[in-house]
Structures are given as structure tokens and as C-alpha cells.
Amino acid sequence: MTIYSYLLLLCMVMFVTFFTQKNNILSLMVVLESLMLITLSSVAVSLNYMAGSSMVMILLLCFAAAEAALSLSLLVCFIQVNSSCEMLAMNKILFAKKS
């Protein structure tokens, strides 16, 4: 098996894990970050075969860092508002009946 096969298998496992996480937002964010890093590593492996593409790798790394910072800031704001990182608290906010 090549490295692409391993990365594809790992990506599928993380994709299934993403949809089975229902209790904690923090674990959901960790799985989402690992999916992003798997995608980044597969792009890095594919760009390794091309010459002169180091700028694309730096750009992708910047996007991954910005995505991680955004998700962490959203999680911190959510925990400050609800004092909990449980998915049940998010469901109460999103699906609350307005009178």
C-alpha cells in the first residue's frame, strides 16, 4: 500500500469518528482538526513530487493555523456563555422554542 492509501483510510476513519461524536464539542473539534491535518499531509506528499511548490505548502499551513485558531476561539466563547462544552447545551440554544 502506498502512503495515499494509508492517508485515505485514516481520513475515512476520522470521518466516521466525526459523526459518531455526540457528547463533547472538544472531542469533535479534535477530530475535525485531525481531518484537516490529514488533508494537509496528503497535499504535502503530493506536492513533494512537484518541484518549486513550497509556497503552496506554506499557504496551506497558514490556512490550517487560521482554522485552528478560529475553532478554538469559538469553543472558548461557547464555554464562557454556557459554562459547559456538552453538545446538549448547544442543542438547547439552537433548537429552543421562541415564544
From Swiss-Prot:
Cell compartments where the protein resides: Mitochondrion membrane
Keywords: Electron transport, Membrane, Mitochondrion, NAD, Respiratory chain, Translocase, Transmembrane, Transmembrane helix, Transport, Ubiquinone
Catalytic reaction equation(s): a ubiquinone + NADH + 5 H(+)(in) = a ubiquinol + NAD(+) + 4 H(+)(out)
E.C. code: 7.1.1.2
Species: Albinaria caerulea
Role according to the record: Core subunit of the mitochondrial membrane respiratory chain NADH dehydrogenase (Complex I) that is believed to belong to the minimal assembly required for catalysis. Complex I functions in the transfer of electrons from NADH to the respiratory chain. The immediate electron acceptor for the enzyme is believed to be ubiquinone.
Keyword NAD included in the entry's annotation: yes
Protein name (record): NADH-ubiquinone oxidoreductase chain 4L
Family: Belongs to the complex I subunit 4L family.
